[in-house]
A protein has these predicted regions:
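Amphipathic alpha-helical "stalk" segments
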Residues: 1-81
Length: 81
């Protein structure tokens, strides 16, 4: 899925086209999933959780590799700048 692809990009500049396109996919899927036109606020809140909620970051890092939660948070923030 998208998270796995993003985890594989860990270390790539979050402002790169590849990373922004993956976050764009995540944005699209989230709009469908949550039936919302604009998911920016929701995605930024999720990014906060990945970075500041130890349980969420540990879970994400355990599944996709150390540093994934922090990287994902930064990538989401960059996309919605």
């Amino acid at each position: 899925g998208i998270y796995k692809k993003l985890a594989e990009k860990r270390g790539t500049d979050v402002s790169s086209f590849e990373v922004k396109s993956l976050i764009g996919e995540l944005d699209f899927v989230s709009k469908q999933l949550y039936q919302m036109e604009d998911v920016k606020q929701l995605m930024l809140e999720i990014a906060d959780s990945y970075e500041k909620n130890p349980a969420m970051s540990e879970s994400m890092d355990k599944q996709y590799g150390a540093g994934t939660a922090e990287y994902l948070g930064k990538a989401v923030r960059e996309f919605y700048k």
